[in-house]
Amino acid sequence: MSEKRRDKRNRILHQGEVQLADGRYRFKYLDNAGEAHYVYSWRLDKNDRTPVGRKKDLSLREKERQIQADLFDQIAANGGNYTVLELVEKYIATKTGVRDSTRAGYQTVINFLKKDPMGKQRIDKVKLSDARLWLIKLQKEKGKSYSAIHSIRGVVRPAFRMAVEDDLIRKNPFDFELATVIVNDSVTREAISREQERRFLKFIQEDWHFSRYYEGIFILFKTGMRISEFCGLTKKNIDFKHRCIVVDHQLIRTAKMEYVIEEPKTESGTRKIPMTPEVEACFRTILKKRSTPKIEPVVGGLSGFLYLDKNGRPMVALHWEKYFEHIVEKYNKTYKEELPKITPHVCRHTFCSNMARSGMNPKTLQYIMGHSDISVTLNTYTHLGFEDAEAEVRRICAG
């Protein structure tokens, strides 16, 4: 019988275990494909002390138990040698048929991971605490906003979920609630009051320069459309006979300055929005003022867009966001009582809140807003306060 191999403390070493000249322990094993791998530790057993000046790590035999469990469950060795960046790239490659805006968001995450040390980390080395600390560092040290971090994790988390499903790793280190780790510093896009809306619209209507955008902004406040939906409207989408707006697409301009027609944001986004007489009058004015370009722009087979820029191209969200910004800036320089930040999306919030205050049936409001989930209608877009609650209680009691 061959003599048992022992370490420097005279302990019997198991098959595959050796102690190196520098005192470290090494374990050699074969993965399910027959390829050799090695793991190291300064400790043989969990009760051993870590040598002074050495990084604390799992003992060799603790690592062996993990390896045996992974081999039994067909978990790939070393996470298949994927880095975080490589895993995310593989995940994105599986996401075919996504919108251009979504694809652009994916590319932003890839570009970020190419520069960040996390992108070079091997996926099996990323633990829950590493994932948490990384996100905290992004906010505290790199100044990333909650929204930006939410977008990054929104790609990394499902990529790691795919790795679990592919038996590359055992657990998803990003499977936790983001709000429990970093501070949500997102600025809530509040609806403005009816009085603020009135002052804002009156200022636009009477301003020699910005009055050209009055009808469009009035429509945004009175229909709750998404700005991309409004920009995508063509003459054919305005049904004067049935007094409704047919919303069945949105207009997007990509980072490459390409104009793209996409389906509405959600399945419920395709809808018909009733027109009030005031909204109908605004559309008629827009069409009356619309000059016929030398070459009618065509995007995705559609033409007849309501608003065109100075180059004869359809106006997009960025145009309107800038108009809103300049209007509020001019208003606040003119009047002592300033207006808060108002954007096209604030118009959407405001419309929803006004309809809720007016007692519109929640399901009807959900349909008009194009929300797939009524909780979005009720919880995200309705900004009701104590005064509204008080008025409702008084109304019920009076009845």
Where in the sequence are the language-model features?
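Short N-terminal "domain-start" leader segments
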Residues: 1-22
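N-terminal DNA-binding module of tyrosine recombinases/phage integrases
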Residues: 20-125, 129, 288-302
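Conserved tyrosine-mediated DNA breakage-rejoining catalytic core shared by Y-recombinases
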Residues: 233-291, 298
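Short functional hotspots where side chains directly engage DNA or cofactors
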Residues: 242-247, 343, 354, 366-384, ...
